[in-house]
Amino acid sequence: MGDHVAQDSAHRRIVSNAEPHSSLYVNGCVLYFWVLGRMSSTLSLNVKRLGQILKEGAEGQVSESGQRLEVASSTYWPVLRQLLISDFNSTRATETAKQLFGNTTARFAAVDGSLNQSLLGGLAVFWAGAYAATGTITYRNDAEPILKYETNFLEKGNGLASCVPIYVDSIPDVELQSPLSWAGRQAISGPLTDQSTVDNSTISNWIMLFSELYLAYTFACGNECQVILLDRSLSGTQSSLLQDTSRRALWKRECATLTMKSDGLGLDEQDLAFSRYRTPNVDGLLPPRGDYLRHSVMFLLEKTNSPLTMDEISGRLYVSETDRIEKLRRYLTKAARESKYFAESNGKYSLLPNLDTAWQRTKKMVDHFGQRFFSSNAGNPLQITNAEGPRWLTTLDLAFLCLFTMNMLIETCRLRRILLIGVTKDTTARDMITHLIPLCISRQIWPGQIGHVPTTDRMLLQAVSMFHHAEVNVPWSTVEYDTAFQTIVRPFREVNGDVSGAVKNRIIQEQLFVKSYVQLDKSVSDDQFRSNVLFIDRLYHSFENAPTLELKHEYGGAIEEVRPILWKSKDVENRVQELIMVTLKAMTHESIPEIFGHNEPLFIADKIAKAQEAHASQMIKGMGHWLVSHPKLRKYAFYMNTFRSRRSEIENARTRA
């Protein structure tokens, strides 16, 4: 009783000096209510503090970034105003289309992919596919082109897909970077679950890339498409594939394709090396410099089909400087002595036997696996049989297949004058402001003095377009420049030459792809509200006769010449870029928010791919139910599931009950 009195007294003291929060009239009595304030706990104070830090930090970062971009746009404007092109003439584009395609109507294909990876007990299922939106574009004088799509995409559309079921314990035999494989470089800091093994696998990604490239290749070979669009960077994809296949020490041990000897599909390590850089110019050669020198000699000997002396080789490759001739001599002598690529007899060099047919056998290999993955019903597409029995293809095999398919696509597009275009969203590239512009300013190609800006090309160009909207009309594009500039920097100290390579002093192949940044749309009501800047790179064709720079690069003990493509200003005519910009602008759609300033055919291809992935996902789930209910497999189903998954399933069932 005493405790209740004490508590009541305490409550009276608390509210005696406080105004009532509200009152209520009940049965002739007025009841007053007080809301007693709660003392703040340590947890609530901590949440409040974190919220304050988050609010102030976010405001500060956004404000600082905006101010930095505003200053950068003003600083870069004197240079960028010379590089932004807004004058695209539909009449000239129609003339270019007629010269390039032989007609004012061209057929296009936009290719995109999707993937799915699921775990059914102990069985992993990897699905991936690529699908295309196709149609025609008709160019007109003094008017926008007319776009027409083929109908019934889901029923009659073009697509490729493949599915690979594989037990989780076999994934390390396929996935080189798996923590369970001998080549894995990850440290296992905790228990590795089956689900994490499947989630971290890249098998579906490799199959999706292979399907996208192979589908694009089939369109190029079909002699129907004049424009092929891919939802990825062409130069970035090729560079990544070259990097993924660069560790020659792994080839013999990890490439299952090297063990295939039947049906004329046998390849050896030298065949792989020969076909890796199979991206020659229209004359059949690579630039005779850097890492491409030996391959340039290989393709020259393949083209001439006869032995050549050292003088004949250097003459046909236009290598005249003493240091470059000596470097070429060292390469050839060492390779012939080690029986790699070349044989020497009486001072003349020739290709080793079978290398002259290496590219044809490589293409046959790609077509074989393309049919196996996407057309054949003969068993698991990722498993082959050699003299030693069944063996899994590895991700290194898939990387080689993707690289060779891309080389085949490039070769076919150049031969048939097809526009091959890559469209990349949300790029973080910064080579224009860190490589191209500083180099051109230092060589007095463009005037100005510009310091480092900690942002990306896309963000800077979006800021310039917004802050200078009165002077920059939409659509616009930067001038096109060689993707080799991504690896070209100003010369290092104590290095002869005009430039150096960004990584290990290497410069990638020039005159293969050119790139630009574009902005395609804006709001009707607000001129400053504009679409995102896109990164576009495309295959360069030698008939364009683009302007180039002559740069000296010291590499491998010789001063070599690099000739990257660069349209120096918006006033330099570029008819193919104009045709592409008119095409891309016609493929936008203002009324669909998801593709504001983007590409409608690629958007449709993405929707087709996602719809097919949804069907595949349901099929995979159905197969899981079939496995656990099949009379002959039921006794194995218990052990297919891990303890964790089985416990989780039982707990969920009990909770629902």
What are these regions (language model features)?
Residues 108-111:
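Short hydrophobic beta-strand that contains or immediately precedes a catalytic carboxylate
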Residues 5-6, 16, 31, 138:
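Polar low-complexity intrinsically disordered regions enriched in Ser/Thr and small residues
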Residues 3, 8-11, 21:
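Intrinsic-disorder-associated, low-complexity terminal segments enriched in Asp/Asn/His/Tyr and depleted
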Residues 134-198:
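Compact, glycine/acidic-enriched structural inserts
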Residues 14, 21-95, 99-101, 162-171, ...:
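Long, contiguous domain-sized segments
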Residues 113-158, 248-261:
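Adenosine ribonucleotide-centric catalytic and binding domains
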Residues 2-3, 39:
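Short, Lys/Arg-enriched, disordered terminal segments
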